Every structure is written in C-alpha cells, then in structure tokens.
Amino acid sequence: MRKRSALGALALSAVAYPFWEARRPRLRRYQLLKAPGMPGLKPEEASYIDGNLPDLRGGCCQSQRRYTGKESATIAVNRQQNPAWQIRILHLSDLHLWSGSEWLTEYVASLAEFTEIDFVALTGDNFCDASGLEMLRRALTPLMKLPGAFVFGSNDYYSGQFKVPLHYFFPEKKPKLRRVPDLPTAEFREFLTSGGWSDLNNQVDTLAITSPARQGRSAREISVALSGTDDPHIGRDEAVQVPDTWGKADFRLALTHAPYARVLDQYAACAADLVLAGHTHGGQVCLPGFGALVNNTDLPLSYSGGVHSWQLGTVDNPAPRVRLGKIYPPVDLQALRNQAGISNPTAARQTTVHIARGLGTSKFTPVRLACPPEAAIITISGLSSDK
C-alpha cells in the first residue's frame, strides 16, 4: 500500500510539474559586442539566469548567476576592450495574456524596476483572448517611461484556439483562413504608440537612444535604425524595408514575430546587427538533454531559442510568404542591399538573432517542460572605430 501511494504521488507530481514550470519565469541576460564595420554581434560572455527578481508566488529571492546549457560555450571576453557606448534592451515576447494569467501581468510590470534598461522590444503574441487588453495596459505602463518598439503576431489579431498538441508536428494540408480579426488590435496599437513606442509592423524608424554613463563612460546619444515586419507566420510580412539612416546608424535593429528563414535572410542581406523574434516558445515542451521537439517555423530545431549567428542561406528552401491563399515570390536580395547602401555583398551575408522563449502559453495548453518562461535583457556594447 505504501509503495502504491508513493508511486501515485510520483505520478501526480510528474503530471503537475509542467503546469508549475509554466508559472516560473526567469530573466536571462546576454552580453554582445558590436564591432565597427562588421555585421552581426559577437557574444561577450556566457548568458546567465538572473535570480535577483522576486518570486511573485513565494516571495523568495536569489542572487547568484547561474550559467546554463549550450549558451555557456561562447567567445571569451577581451577585457582590454573599452566600449564607446552601451545599451540594454529588454526583449519581451509571447505574453498570451488572458484573465487567468494575472501572475504574468505582475511579473512584466516588475521588470520596470530594472533602471539599467534603456529600450524595450515587444515581439508579438501579446493576447490569448480579448480579456488581455486591460492586463497588457497594466503590465506595460510601468515600462513606457522608456523608449520602445513593437511588432505583432497572429495572437494580436486573432484569439487563441484549441489545437491538439500533435498538430504542430505535421504541416497543415489546408490551413484554416481566419479573415476577420477578433482582438482589440487597434486599441492596443494606440496604447503603445501614444506611449511613444515605434510601430514596426512593415515599417521603419530611427531613434536617438541615450547610452547612459556607466563604468567610467560618459553618457552619449546613439543612432538606432529600426526595421520590422508584421507576422510572417500568417503571411503578413512584406518585403523588408530599411530607413535612410540604416547605413550610417550606430546600431541596426530589426523586429519580427516568427523567425522564418525568408525574413532572417533579408536582414542578413542588409547587414542588420541584431534581429529580435519570438513565436517558438523555445519549443515549450522539450526533452531534457535534447531540446525542442518542434518550433513551428522553417528553421532547424537548434534555432528554437537563444542567441544565434544567422548566415544567409542557412535554410536551402525557405518557406514562401503565403497570405490568404496567395503565394508571393521571393524578395530580390540585391535590390534590398542597394536600398540599404550595402556595397560589399560578401560582408552582408550574416546577422545575429535572438529568439525569445517567451513568457506565456495558450490558455488551452498552460504547460512547459524543460523550457521555463523567459524575459531577456540584451546588453549591446559598441566598440570605438578608432580601436
């Protein structure tokens, strides 16, 4: 009897654990170097989990750096380099807020307490259903004292629907077309833009962002050229555009929701320094020691989450843009290079991408396994051109 009870308790714990893990958010930090004249970024040190945020469900607080996984195998920092500027980007994605995720509203709002954040990037799928609008306002208002930019995912237009989990392992032969949005997209967009954040859904912008005085550096403004696409997963992405300031900006940043190869190739072709994306949930349900089983894009599973270098042509046959049954031809990458002012095509073949593991889940599958919810702070250190 005692053995049977122990086995029953073990089975119950195994079933309950993925629900528990889905409500244990963590903050991951990345340190990346921007070298003048070089596309993409280099890791400065291993990423680590920051345990300094309070646990909103238990009041506990940790203070250690905890290095994890393959992302620990990165380039060692050259401590002799003295960056000319530095900005810290808070990357949030896939909140999927609804009335049952009040805990996540509190967590996101608490991130505003990190005064070293200089910029906020929001990469889509903010809703699960329409009840999330007021929660999003409460979650993001404390962060809107900072400059920011956003793009949308499908769950900023259409509410989440129940899908059998095995659905993601097999391509849809006849995908369902949802033509009429049922979420308060216009109201949410107005909330974000009225707070001064840049709408990058198939749009561009240029911002002057302050690199604060830190570690002996003086404060200075840097020019950040911004580009973005609407959600590639549902074919709302148009050909990438870049602002006129792209070639001369201190930093070139791109946002998209779903990291499809056709979009990453375009940003590699125009020498973006960093692309921020979400959508994959890091795989959401992963095998310990193996990783993601599916990422719902055309990328290899190794690109399901984290920071990666992306080479143009990594995927041989990128999925085409399909919108409401229409298949669009590939974008002319040479024309894009010309628009971006990239004269050396051999240099414009790579970029760096951060694929967020996301903070939320659908209310229909509120579980995670070996893939906790994450927010990320990405520190970009720009090296001086006279080094």
Regions found by a protein language model. Give the residues of each.
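Beta-strand-turn-beta hairpins that frame and shape the catalytic cleft
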Residues: K34-Y48, L53, C60, V77-L90, ...
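Conserved beta-sheet core of the metallophosphoesterase superfamily
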Residues: P259-A376
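N-terminal active-site segment of His-dependent metallophosphoesterases
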Residues: K3-A139, S159
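Binuclear metal-dependent hydrolase catalytic cores centered on His/Asp/Glu-rich metal-binding motifs
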Residues: K163-W197, Q203, A208-D265, T365-R368
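Short, conserved loop/helix-junction motifs that constitute active-site signature segments
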Residues: F114-T115, L140-K145, D244-K248, Y267-C270
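Core catalytic region of metal-dependent phosphoesterases/phosphodiesterases
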Residues: K34, W98-T210
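Active-site neighborhood of phospho(di)ester-bond hydrolases with catalytic His/Asp-centered motifs
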Residues: H91-S93, F119-D125, G148-S154, L200-N202, ...
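Active-site environment of divalent metal-dependent phosphoester hydrolases
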Residues: L97-W103, F127-S131, N155-F162, L200-I209, ...
